[in-house]
Amino acid sequence: MVSYIMIIYPDTKLEEKLWSQGYQIVAGLDEAGRGPLAGPVVAGCVVINSLDQVVPFVRDSKKMTKKKREEAFSLITERSFAFGYGIVSAADIDRLGIQKAVLEAMSIALQVVEEKVGKRVDYIIADGMNISSIPNYKMDKITQGDLLHYSISASSVVAKVVRDRLMYDYAKKYPLYGFEKHVGY
């Protein structure tokens, strides 16, 4: 018996639909660091405004090897119309709670992107139904959005790579804590 592994890649159909409805700046948002016991939560935000900015092998960061994520990160940050990330510390997570910390990280990432493009994002597509809406933005929260939609997948890669790099840096500074083991999601 032969078995096959089907690899699902996200598409840009939602982004294209929103562009056709007049939304020029469509931002994907996702986070990394919601589950681990140590470290910050990081949100990534990616905007593409043409299909030639798509990195073909990008998909949900959880489905990629570290090497492929790093390669994808390099290409995403080079090709995208704009990208950004927001970091909320472990201390702030403890103070705010994880839901508010994720919202804060996403708001920071969004602000970074808006500063880069010089205008307000028209529409947000974000991974997950259990996140809070960002006030005063049109926003779709999509279950498994990081599997389905390119901008969200690219944002998941940005968030994951930035967070992993931080955790590896913490591990070098504080080797007794094993921070390199807290690079989960």
How should each PLM-predicted stretch be described?
Residues 1-185:
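RNase H-like, Mg2+-dependent phosphodiesterase core
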